[in-house]
Each structure stands twice: as C-alpha cells, then as structure tokens.
Amino acid sequence: MQLGEQLLVSSVNLPGAHFYSLESARGGGGGGGGGGGGGGGSVSLLPGAAPSPQRLDLDKASKKFPGSLPCQAGSAEPAGAGAGAPAAMLSDADAGDTFGSTSAVAKPGPPDGRKGSPCAEEELPSAATAAATARYSMDSLSSERYYLPSPGPQGSELAAPCSLFQYPAAAGAAHGPVYPASNGARYPYGSMLPPGGFPAAVCPPARAQFGPAAGSGSGAGSSGGGAGGPGAYPYGQGSPLYGPYAGTSAAGSCGGLGGLGVPGSGFRAHVYLCNRPLWLKFHRHQTEMIITKQGRRMFPFLSFNINGLNPTAHYNVFVEVVLADPNHWRFQGGKWVTCGKADNNMQGNKMYVHPESPNTGSHWMRQEISFGKLKLTNNKGANNNNTQMIVLQSLHKYQPRLHIVEVTEDGVEDLNEPSKTQTFTFSETQFIAVTAYQNTDITQLKIDHNPFAKGFRDNYDSMYTASENDRLTPSPTDSPRSHQIVPGGRYGVQNFFPEPFVNTLPQARYYNGERTVPQTNGLLSPQQSEEVANPPQRWLVTPVQQPVTNKLDIGSYESEYTSSTLLPYGIKSLPLQTSHALGYYPDPTFPAMAGWGGRGAYQRKMAAGLPWTSRMSPPVFPEDQLAKEKVKEEISSSWIETPPSIKSLDSSDSGVYNSACKRKRLSPSTPSNGNSPPIKCEDINTEEYSKDTSKGMGAYYAFYTSP
C-alpha cells in the first residue's frame, strides 16, 4: 500500500487533520522502508500550516481488523517518533515493525503484508466533526481543494422535493434570482419556478437547510446567489441551502424559504402561475387584451396557487395592473413597434381585490386563486366600488402584479409594516390593451382556446378540427360536392348499420337537406349530371325501403307537404329495375318524392338550431318561396300541391307529371273527385309545364296502371 493511499484512508478519522501535500508524502514514503527507520517516513505539512495539536496515538485509533488481539499499552510508539519526527502518520513499514516487535502474542498478518489493527480503548470524535475539516490538495490533478461532504442524514434530506429551484418574487428588481453557470451566463428564474418547488405541507418544519448557513453564500433568492458558497446551488450539499429570512428585506424580494413554525413576518409566500403554458402561447405573439366601455374579461385570465402563508394570519389578495414600459405601441408590418411615449396621466382604477379577501392563509393555500371575473375597460368614469373594473388605455403595454398583504382580522392593513406586503410579477402575463385584435395569430389563439369567443366563429364548420374526410357530410361552401343531393360519403353509414338503426339516428348526425341543394335556377346543374353518370354507386336504398324521406332529406321541398296528400304516389316504392329509374337524379320526380311516406325523421324546424341555417334562408331559393305562396292560395285542391314543388324545374322530363295527371283523369280504377276536376288538371298542364315527355314514360304508365 502506498503512503498516499494510507493518508486518504486513515486521516479521515483524525480529529485535527490538515491539508497534506502528496509530493512530500511521496518523498517521505521512500524513506520509510527500513524496519526501524521511522524518521524517513514522516510527512511535512503545507507551508503556513500550523503543527498538529496532537500526535497520532495508536491506542485511540479505530480498529480496522477485528481479528487482531489487543495490544499492550505503551507499546505502540514507533522508534522513529522519538527522534523528533513531527506528529504525523506512519508508513506501512513503520507500523508493521512496531506491531510485529511489541506484540508477543499477535497472530501473523494477512499474506499481503498488512498487519493487525491498533487498540481502540477510547471513543473517537464524531465522524461529522472530522469530515467537516477533511480537505486535501490533489496537486496531481489541479491546485484546487476538494471538499468531501459528510455522509450524514443531511445529504439525504437535501434531495427532498423542498430543495428544488428557488422561485422568489420579483419586486423592484429587474430579474429574479440568477444562477451563475460555468460559462458565466446568468439565467433568471424569477418568473418561472416557485421558491420552494413544493408547498410547505410536504416539507417538515424542522429542516436543516432552513437554518443559518454559517460561512456560506446567501440564499440564491435574496442576493442572486453567492457564487462561491454552497447556498448558491439548489442541489448543493454540506451547509444549509438557505439563509434565515430577514424581516427587514424589501417587500416582494422573496428570499429563502421560511419554516412553517417561524412566527411573525418570517412567512414568505410562494406563488405559482397555474395556466403558465397558455400564457406562454400568447406571449410568443405579444398578448393582446380587448378593452371596452362595458368591460371585457381577460383571456387568458390570471390564476395562481399560493403557498408559504401563515395559516392563521389574514391576508388580502389583489391584482394591480401597471404600465410595463413608457412607450406607446402600434401594430405595423405584422409586428408591434413603439410610436412615442405613453400617457402616464391616465386616471382610473388599477387594482382588483379578490372577492374572498380578507381571508386566512389556510384558505388562500387550500385551492387555486382565480381572477376570472376581472374586467378591463377604457371608460374613465367606471364605478370602482361595484365592478372593480381596471381602467386602461388602448395601445399601451401593461404588467399585472399580484399583491399579498397581511392584514388584521377586520381587514385593516398596517401601513407601518411594509414587510407584510409581498408582490409577485410574471413577465409572461404582459399584454397590450387594444379595442380590436391586431395580430391574426392572437385572434386564432383566442378562438382555439377561449370557449366564449363565439363572436369570431362565423360558421359552425370552424369548430371542426377533423379533416373533411372524417365528417359525415361536406361543408356547404365546398365545390362541387355542395351541388350533390346525395353525396357519396353521406349515406355510406348504411353499409355498416342495419336499416332500423339508420332510421333512428338523430337528425343532428346529418346536415339539413338545404345544404346540399344547388344554388342554381334548376335543381340539378350539368356538373352534377356528369357526377351521377354511374348512379348505382350512390343509390344505397333497396327497393323495399318505403320511407325515402329518411334518405333524401331535402327539407326545402317537403316542408309544406304531407304524406296523405301524396298517398297515390306513395303506395309503392319506385321500381329500380329499369335503366331510366336509375337515372333518377336528373329526373324531377324525386324532389317531389322527398315528401312521400313518413316525414317524422327530418323536419325543417330542426334546421333552426344549426348555425348555418341563416345562410340557407328562403331568399336563397326564390322558386321554393313562390311555390309555398301558391300552395297557400290554392290549398283546396290535392293535386295543386304537387306541381309547385317542381314548378321551378326546367328539365325536359317534367312531362312525367303531365302524364300522371292525365292518368288520374282517365283511369277507370281511380274515379275523379269533386275537388280535383279534370279541367283543372288540364289547365295546370297547359300553363305551367312543358308538353315534352321523357323516353321512359312507359315505365311510369306501367307502374301507375298496375292494380
């Protein structure tokens, strides 16, 4: 074993160990090889170091090898020690000769040459006291001194949650506490992390790190961190992290943590900004807040968690909004620029006291403290007593500040004790007061995160976050999909659900039929005729499905008609076997068939609850409006109700209804009624409809003439 290793191992237990030079230790180790030559094994002290107050007494040394027999008293003094060698340590050779010669009954040592341990008859000093002064100069590495921390229980306590980043308030100072990095950079954490990291409830009151830090740097929260002392590092070990709280410090300078048991002004609040991530999103684009005459609430609003208060003391908690800089701002070129000086003569209320003030510290620490009802206004004559609206001036930058003031039980503040007032500032809560949003990024953030920002949503589709393919129906502004009566993806649900389930789906699952009617003179545009060239891919209704209304929810053409008036046409479902029947989309028959059968699933009144109905009002469909008026005038005839629904159609297939009307008059199986004379039917056909007939008229004749 080398002498340097012996020094590192054994001197830790020395009560008065000093700094030893390894160079001199190596020199002394070379002369200690002789059996009785102890003089060469002595070690010199560092220059300027005081001599050891006591020499090494082997009788008081620790027992390293319990297997050795006790030594005789007075036999542990080395031969070289009497030659005037300074009180130091023995080399392995010296110790081996001594123990080997004086202990007559000693057992042979281990094969590696180590000898038995010395006697231990007296109690050694505590390990913590010895370790507090155990420092060495490793000149083989560098000229610095390395401090060896004690392995006591204090080191484990410092790893507790209470030793997180310090987070004092910033009051009067431009920045909070700073942590000096290795490269000299300084990082302010004053508006980011709380002073204790965790509430005092998880920290026992009697914590060692809250006591005085003798000889260490001051707490990082009060002076910016003593760069050399252990108190400058939140994860440091050894001496206590935080110095004692000084009640005479400036108000708002949150220093070290105050223990829960310290009375009086030693309580310091620790404040967290609860919705800080949301504030940061707005802060990246320079937050803007709307101000109005009636007052407008802030979004994001101020929300805090408070810890470290005296549970039995009473506090007032209020927010003050002050100017953040002396500049007047304007939005130009996509960014905010200064344009002159701010108006400092603005009169009006600048404070908002929380409605629950005054209250005890335990009340404030129990839950989140929200200022969601705080309103901003530009009305200088706002009543301060009722609404507590904060009066601001447009295009000025403001900084909210949180004040916590200790008061009496009656809510009276002691103005002679400024230390009872604590102020906290969060730089990310700065905002510019505006009468209308200037930055579109801020507007979008308000829409995305504020559930009450309905004034910015001009239509319902802006609330969707899913892609267009994920919707059941398309947007009314899409083209050409908006010109389809039955979009392909709209009724694809019938492939997966049985018919009873589809019929019972709520109407809110589908858009109203008015959204899909083309805004043209005719019902079908040429573009749609091309789209439905292959109709079997879109027609998903089987021939046995009678309630066609549930599939063709065209509310604009069936709102005024009942199934009873069209009963002759709703007895059977339309046969889909013929090629002409499959070409139903350009055929004007189907708009009228939208009213056949039961119409309870889709009502026009349901469209009133949908945000887009204002766009699709009746003026958009003038033909439909005229048709409704004509129906009201001639409601006495059951045959009159059918033609108005197709009166606006300019399709060449309108002769289908012409033939159907004649069949009503000529068929012997269906006698004419008194309220539908044949002449009336002929007049309607002559005045309003074309005489042309479609190619597949035979299919309709065959259908209606069948018994």
UniProtKB/Swiss-Prot annotation:
Keyword Transcription regulation recorded: yes
Subcellular location: Nucleus
The protein's name: Eomesodermin homolog
Modification sites for Phosphoserine: 117
DNA-binding region of this protein: 278-458
Record note on disruption phenotype: Embryonic lethal due to peri-implantation defects. Mutant embryos arrest soon after implantation and fail to form organized embryonic or extraembryonic structures. Conditional mutants, with expression abrogated in the inner cell mass of embryos from early implantation stages onward, display gastrulation defects.
Residues with the Phosphothreonine modification: 473
Annotated Gene3D superfamilies: Transcription factor, T-box (2.60.40.820)
Listed InterPro entries: p53-like_TF_DNA-bd_sf (IPR008967), T-box_assoc (IPR032385), T-box_DNA-bd (IPR046360), T-box_sf (IPR036960), TF_T-box (IPR001699), TF_T-box_CS (IPR018186)
Biased composition annotated in UniProt, kind: Polar residues: 648-657
Name of encoding gene: Eomes
GO biological process: adaptive immune response; anatomical structure morphogenesis; astrocyte differentiation; blastocyst development; cardioblast differentiation; CD8-positive, alpha-beta T cell differentiation involved in immune response; cell differentiation; cell differentiation involved in embryonic placenta development
Bias (Low complexity) ranges: 73-93, 667-678
